[in-house]
Every structure is written in C-alpha cells, then in structure tokens.
Amino acid sequence: MENKLDKLNLGSGNEIKEGFINVDFKQDKGVDIVHDLNKHPWPFENNSFKEVVAENVIEHLDNFIQAMEEIYRVTKPNASIKMSVPYWNSSFAYIDPTHKRGFHEHTFSFFDPESPYCKQRSYYSKARFKVKSFSFVIAPFAPYFLLPFVKNIEIKNFILKKIIGLLGNMFSNIILELRVELQRV
C-alpha cells in the first residue's frame, strides 16, 4: 500500500495527483495544503518525502535556488524529483507574465556533485541532486502547436537530444519544455 504522506505534488493547480499531497497557493478541489511556495520554510518536516513532482511551477517562484534548497530539505535521501519547466528560449518561458525564468538542460547540473558546474561553483547552494535524466518537449509545425491535432513530442534518445539541443540553443521555439528527473544525494 502506497503512503500518500511521502509523495508531494508542488504547485498542483488543477492537476491533482492521486496518492500525493497536493500543494497550491490557492484552495481548489483536491488541493490538500494551501501554501505560497515563495514563503520559506515550506510547511513540511525535513526528510519527509520519497517523491516530489513539480510540473510547470518552479518557473513561477521568486528564488529558484531557495526553492531547490527547500526541495532538498523536505526530501529523503535518494528521493526522486520530477520537474517540467519551460526551455530558456521558448516563448513558453515568457508568454506567461508570472514566469520568472526559463531553464537550460545544464541548469540543474549546478546541483549535481559529479558535474563540473557544481564542482566549480559549489558555493551556490548546499542542495545536491544527481541528474538522472532529462528530455526535451518539442512541438512540430510551430506556431501551430496550439491546434488540437498537433501533439507534443518528447525527445529522450541521447543522439536526438544532442541534435535537438544544438538546434534549440541556436533557434528559438524548437524546444518548448525541459523535463528533468533528479535524485536527492
């Protein structure tokens, strides 16, 4: 039997996840805890969660590093953290006026102790996560991706990620979203 008390869905909005504690800044159907994630500390004990999901929420927060430190604080060692965030040069990063930032595929490497980014700038944060995987979400035929018959495509293949990543860094709106899975160290 799964324990709902050790899985956290941050910024749930109307995307309520069964078996998770659903947190949002506004009361809505299925929201278990109302809390503004910009207010620290979050209302959870240290080392409480084995899994955290943050789909399209981190980009709304005022302080990204502080949010990562809170995720680190509330997760158990080896916890799984799954995030979806807008890609740095996607229009999705800045169309929504409540978005504070976009993200690059190496952004989360600053928290990975095996990464040269983390090794060079270990003073940025004490939070440590291993980057388990990442993928790109692209939508063919932009700007037609809002049409109901045009589906997003998630790129997980290593070689395709290299190619799409190169193109996505040269041209805007090729990569819409970054999905990353982290493991708390």
PLM feature segments, named:
Residues I65-Q66, K76, S80-V185:
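S-adenosyl-L-methionine-dependent methyltransferase catalytic module, highlighting the catalytic core
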